[in-house]
Amino acid sequence: MQFSLGANLFFWPKTQVETFYQQAMTCEADIIYLGETVCSKRRELRIHDWLNLAKEIAKSGKQVVISTMTLLESAAEIQTLKKYCANGDFLIEANDLSAVQILHDYQLPFVAGPAINCYNLSTLKVLLKQGMFRWVMPVELSKDWLASLLSQAQQSSIRQQFECEVFSWGYLPLAYSARCFTARSENRAKDDCQYCCINYPQGRKMKSQEGEQVFTLNGIQTMSGDQYNLVNEVNNMQAIGVDVIRISADNNQAFDKLRQFKQQLASPQYFPLDKNTECNGYWYQIAGMAKVN
């Protein structure tokens, strides 16, 4: 089993991003994803910056994957996507079907990211024909659903053709919209957002009228209010055939989580979830914000 550090989903200053990935070079992750997946206006790092950063990380011996945008809204964004896909050095995580098609046209293998709506065996087969070699399960699906689908893949003799990766810690990316919720929360138009996302390095918290934290606003992305945590499921995931466990790169705590998750393989330990900040409901096919201890 391998461990991955998912792409940072938030908007940070360039120096903070570079410092974070300098630390990532010596972390427990076998695979490091990086790149802008949420908003093309987040230009603290341009394409050459991301690729140069990827080259530096690759020197540490880790597999580097460039993650692409989840919602493409212009011809310019498609052109940028094509440049990433044609980088010539690094694998790509496709988070939109346009990326899947471009990579198929280029005859390049790819990772199907969690934003790709792949819920059944038929879709898995389509993605495999397109060139997928690793599939990241959509975050809202359950352990039982995953076990069933992997079993179906085994029975269809395609299971050995792809790796399975599960988002296992961090704020869950739940939905995407052409509207920018962070800008709206500051009474700004999207076209005049003044890059306000950078003021919320872990997103902007959103509470219900009852005062319960339900979501995290991150630009056009709506995330879970609590951090998803499957630390007690590492060995169960291994047993059903998960190949890669993903830790989201949302702050320096991610490095501690990588160590903690990896240690579960050698010496399993039970960690009760924090009732105020963590959740794991989706894994048990119940409300995502629920906590099962």
Mark where each language-model region is.
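Active-site pocket-lining/capping segments in soluble small-molecule metabolic enzymes
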Residues: 1-118, 122, 126, 137-293
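Acidic/polar active-site rim loop that often engages polyanionic ligands
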Residues: 126-132
